[in-house]
Each structure stands twice: as C-alpha cells, then as structure tokens.
Amino acid sequence: MCIRDREKIPWEIPSELLLSIQGIISINMIHIASWNCTKSLFNESSKLLKNGQFLMLYGPFKIGSKHISQSNELFDISLKMQNESWGVRDLGEVSEEANKYDFIEEELIRMPANNFSVIYRKGSL
C-alpha cells in the first residue's frame, strides 16, 4: 500500500489491512520530503506496529554527519536546490528521532549506489 500524502495524519489505511500489518517499508522517501514527514513516518508507524515489528528505511544517508561519497554530496546539493527542506539525512539524527517513538536501529545494511537499508525494531528500548 502506498501512502501518498506523507504529512497527513492519521494515515488512512483500510480496516481490512490494519490487522495484517507485519512491518512498514519506506523507500527513497525521507531525503525528498520535509523533516516533518520523517517525524510523521515514525509517529504513524509507532501507532500501527506492535512491539517486535519492523520499520525499514531505504535510501542515501550521511554517517557521522558526513557523506559517504562525492556523488551523495552532489545529490544532496541538487535536492536542496529543488527544495530547501529536502536533503540526504544524517543517520544519527534519523535514529535519534526513531528512538522518540520507541524504535531502535537494529541493522544497517550497505546497498548499491551508496544507499543503505536501515531496519528499526519497535519496542526494543
């Protein structure tokens, strides 16, 4: 299922799907959305997921406030030129926000094209 309006809360999810949610995957979202969308993602996910379920993010991240490649740095600049609220997020800041909603970073997986998959687990704090 695709949530198109990322800032709209609560998310409108058909009732027949609510009981079958086992995890949430967000691909290439938080760098092309405002920081409020990231907050909304964690907030709404925390309401929908049970303890032990996962939220996975995929996309580019800075590590320790540093870009992992020159191409990611150039991509970040191009995003900010399109919209000043967009940009490659620092993983530490994202995980800090996740912690506020009872998610803990469980696994970080390096992916092709200087991207990462980050798996958060609910209720692991």
Residue locations for each model-derived region?
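Short conserved loop adjoining the S-adenosyl-L-methionine
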Residues: 9-19
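Conserved small/polar residues in nucleotide/adenosyl-binding loops
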Residues: 1-5
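A conserved beta-strand element that flanks and buttresses the S-adenosyl-L-methionine
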Residues: 25
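Conserved Class I S-adenosyl-L-methionine
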Residues: 68-92
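Conserved beta-strand signature within the Rossmann-like core of class I S-adenosyl-L-methionine
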Residues: 51-65
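Core SAM-dependent methyltransferase catalytic element
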Residues: 101-125
